[in-house]
Amino acid sequence: MDCKIEIIPRVLHFKQPAGTSRGTYTTRKVWYLHFTAPEFPNWVGIGECAPLPNLSCDDLPDYAEVLAKICRQVENQGGKLDMEALCKYPSILFGLETAIRHFFEGSWALWDTPFSRGEAGIPINGLIWMGDFNRMLAQIEKKMEAGFRCIKLKIGAINFEEELALLQHIRSHYSSKEIELRVDANGAFSPTDAMEKLKRLSELDLHSIEQPIRAGQWEEMARLTSESPLPIALDEELI
């Protein structure tokens, strides 16, 4: 099938700075893909490629050039994807898969589920971006007022003792039955101090921690997951 993929770059602006252990985001560059085919002139499929700077494994200095090259290859292959070759570019694979599936479904409702039919919701956590103590506390209180009962905090950017104090403040007012707490370090801890920090965090009755150390340190991560008193959820490690 003859097809065409148009690449549309955009810069999105955060309504408020989004802090992580790798820095604070105020903008986000994304590339939208428009998948079309002359055979079906009224159809279009839209996908989004959005690698996170300093976090995504395919955050490349020549990302735009790589994306353009891959899109031309997909056009030459009639819209077929080389899944094995694209595994190292997960954000590009996601954008292409979404655009192509959207094109052939002809609808944003890609799956027939109670959620897509508007019959049921999906429980999610209230995400708290990094900031100073008072700013994070204000975010938490706002999420709880909105009805969230699972709170996830980004940690690793401010002083660890301040982060502990913030978690202790929450626990002093709400038990684990009232509020489920999760934390995400985005690889902020070093292998040498990670275990001590995990032990201290575990005393606060947390549900889990995501990515305590940077991805790719498999032996260290294996040791931590086997010895940590706090359950570890893999995040960047899985990409």
What residue spans do the PLM features occupy?
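Short, well-ordered alpha-helical microsegments
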Residues: 133, 191, 217-221
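A short, conserved beta-to-alpha structural element at the edge of catalytic cores
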Residues: 205-216
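Hydrophobic "anchor" residues on beta-strands that sit immediately upstream
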Residues: 180, 206-207, 231
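N-terminal capping/lid subdomain adjacent to the active-site entrance of alpha/beta enzymes
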Residues: 1-181, 186-188, 195, 199-203
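Catalytic alpha/beta core domains of metabolic enzymes, predominantly
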Residues: 216-239
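Active-site proximal loops enriched in glycine and acidic residues that flank catalytic Cys/His/Asp
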Residues: 185, 213, 236
